[in-house]
Amino acid sequence: MSVSVLSPTRALGGVSGLLQVVSLLGLVLLLLKVAQLYLHRQWLLKALHQFPSPPSHWFYGHKKEFQQESELPLLLKRVEKYPKACARWLWGTSALVSVYDPDYMKMVLGRSDPKPQRTYKYLNSWIGTGLLLLEGQKWFQHRRMLTPAFHYDILKAYVGLMANSVRVMLDKWEELVSQDSHLEIFGHVSLMTLDTIMKCAFSHQGSVQTDRCSDQGEEVSPAEGGRAGEGEEKEDLGLPRHPPLCQSKYGLPCRDHLDQMPYTTMCIKEALRLYPPIPVIGRELSKPITFPDGRSLPAGILVSLSFYGLHHNPTVWPNPEVFDPSRFAPGSTRHSHAFLPFSGGSR
């Protein structure tokens, strides 16, 4: 009698053969992926050979180094050792070039390279696709629409409101400091910012810094009509609702005095140099680039523009850790791209 086609022995043999085929295909795909990663690493090594960096591990790059030490101190060490730029290996097959030289900055920001979506996509869920993440034509359109709203003449009406919000915060600080020498300011500054936005953008009456939480979503329409900030234009920056002080020769400063306070402007710029609001941005090169010193990078390389590193570069700013407002004194000269607290060029 012949053996049945559906016998258990033949069925097991069929399953075993299928597993062998699947295992073989998986092994082939794995080898192809390993070869692809190897070739990509070799391409990166060749592309970045002109940009030295500290020794890195073949698999996890410089990750261990950055895990053992804080990011900023380590960055400053690299800025001092490699004054213009250096390579940073994120993984064995992923790397970028960190730039903190004004000539390099000018070259990259003068182009229209796209933002690296593999990095910026994680910001979408946090801040949304706004002006910071837009690029190309959409960025130009949104920028063109928003720029008139931030014209100096329009912002004049809101100076009093902004100063009022800051004053409320400072009063709270005085009370808290008298109780404890330690004060965490982040939450207070965030609430002050919300207070300013509520007053200027939505004409909210009151202060979210002092109101109860249940009151913060109440009436936001103007009580007396007119635009937000109307009636505040003549307030001084130190004590609102006292116009005579603003008019006094030795009174507290008001909005009209801002242009006559060069040292205050110097201090603000020096603070922005030490602590830039935008510490770093990224660009993915869409075409090769050659820098003024002859070094070059091919298309596809990720470039990290470190404004924090630029502002703390001793070859650009002598004694960069010292707070020295005289760096921005009228008549002082510097590279056009040595001071970039809010980035520069097209987005």
Where are the language model's segments positioned?
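Cytochrome P450 heme-thiolate "Cys pocket" and heme-binding signature region
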Residues: P148, A329-R347
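Conserved cytochrome P450 K-helix/beta-meander segment immediately N-terminal to the heme-binding cysteine loop
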Residues: L305-S332
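Conserved cytochrome P450 K-helix E-x-x-R motif and the immediately C-terminal K′/meander segment
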Residues: K63-P83, C213, G217, L245-R295, ...
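Cytochrome P450
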Residues: S2-L30, W89-V97, D153-N164, E174-K199, ...
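Conserved cytochrome P450 catalytic core segment spanning the I/J/K helices
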Residues: L74, H151, S178, T210-G251, ...
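Conserved, non-catalytic sequence blocks in retroelement Pol enzymes and Pol-derived host proteins
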Residues: A47-F51, E65-Q68, L134, F150-Y158, ...
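N-terminal membrane-proximal hinge/A-helix region immediately C-terminal to the signal-anchor transmembrane segment
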Residues: S2-Q137, Q141, G160-K172, A338
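Central I-helix of cytochrome P450 enzymes
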Residues: T193, I197, A201-F202, T210-Q216, ...
